[in-house]
Amino acid sequence: MVREKVRVSTRTLQWKCVESRVDSKRLYYGRFILSPLMKGQADTIGIAMRRALLGEIEGTCITRAKFEKIPHEYSTIVGIQESVHEILMNLKEIVLRSNLYGTCNASICVKGPGCVTAQDILLPPSVEIIDNTQHIASLMEPIHLCIGLQIERNRGYHIKSPNNFQDGSYPIDAVFMPVRNANHSIHSYGNQNEKQEILFLEIWTNGSLTPKEALHEASRNLIDLFLPFLHAEEENLHLGKNKYNVTFPLFTFHKKLAKLRKPKNEIALKSIFIDQLELPPRIYNSLKGSKIHTLSDLLNKSQEDLMKMKHFRIEDVKQILDILEIEKAFHNRFNEENVENAFISSFFLNKTKGQKKDEMGFESLE
């Protein structure tokens, strides 16, 4: 039997932004191309990227508003042109950008007469408003308007529950999608035997992300989704009696650093804060949210403990391991005692560097 040769492209894939514009503060547009692709690949990538752009990217929204002494959502407030419902709809349209983890609070407290806009919202430092001119309400009389707000970072679309009213606060339908729309098209070229394709990808965003940032984040999310399949063999994943239960490997550096938790080093480890590890914001926030503040706290956790934390994945364990450079320490020519001392000394050196920076006027540690 004669096997047909499978033709594999040896050309390097390249992508380029061919058009970029800002139509308004809340509407950005970008057009990108990826080539050369073999027949069928453009559609595969285009469909996956569009779904990731529209459904996998996180955004920040106002999800709840609290008014004082308002009986129901369709009430009117004396001296305010809009009803409570209209104010809630205006708050829903506010576009925010943040590196927030979870939820936080904000507020509006103004005195009329005058127009209340997005710039009147008092926000935490981690959140910023894209368009300060967005309208919220019109105060026709010299009255005070105070609204408590809840801000959340999430993804997708959350519809408010009709029964989710808590002591004068009202839920708001939240659209966490920074990407307003995404389209892909395909251009084929070449002869019948060596047909190749160019993928065109169009992205519209609400201004909280640029199209290029959205493309980058969607790509990273897709990579994260496929990583378990890539590392299935090296991770030695196996199924137990319940075919849906997956047993993960042991926490790699938990055993190797057992000696670092000896009494003589415990004080040193408690003096090394995770702020000094230069962790990615998502991993750092996840550890902080679980009250892990020092290297000692981290090393006293098993992998099972870490995997129970919200948004924590097996790849994050690997990333922590890389940052700590444990593998490098355990494969060099030093003995175990020297490794321990070198490991701890390196962190105190970083700490000292950070203190010097503070003396020079910088706020953050290295």
From Swiss-Prot:
UniProt entry tagged with the keyword Transport: no
Domain comment (free text): The N-terminal domain is essential for RNAP assembly and basal transcription, whereas the C-terminal domain is involved in interaction with transcriptional regulators and with upstream promoter elements.
Family: Belongs to the RNA polymerase alpha chain family.
Chief place of localization: plastid
Stretches for region Alpha N-terminal domain (alpha-NTD): 1-233
GO cellular component: chloroplast; DNA-directed RNA polymerase complex; mitochondrion
Domain of life: Eukaryota
MF terms in GO: DNA binding; DNA-directed RNA polymerase activity; protein dimerization activity
Keyword terms: Chloroplast, DNA-directed RNA polymerase, Nucleotidyltransferase, Plastid, Transcription, Transferase
Record region (Alpha C-terminal domain (alpha-CTD)): 264-366
Subcellular location: Plastid, Chloroplast
Catalytic reactions on record: RNA(n) + a ribonucleoside 5'-triphosphate = RNA(n+1) + diphosphate
Quaternary data: In plastids the minimal PEP RNA polymerase catalytic core is composed of four subunits: alpha, beta, beta', and beta''. When a (nuclear-encoded) sigma factor is associated with the core the holoenzyme is formed, which can initiate transcription.
Record InterPro entries: DNA-dir_RNA_pol_insert, DNA-dir_RNA_pol_RpoA/D/Rpb3, DNA-dir_RpoA, RBP11-like, RNAP_asu_C, RNApol_insert_sf
Gene3D superfamilies listed in its UniProt record: 5' to 3' exonuclease, C-terminal subdomain, DNA-directed RNA polymerase, insert domain, RNA polymerase, RBP11-like subunit
Disulfide bonds: none
EC number annotated for this UniProt entry: 2.7.7.6
Lineage: Eukaryota, Viridiplantae, Streptophyta, Embryophyta, Tracheophyta
One Pfam family named in its UniProt record: RNA_pol_A_bac
Protein name: DNA-directed RNA polymerase subunit alpha
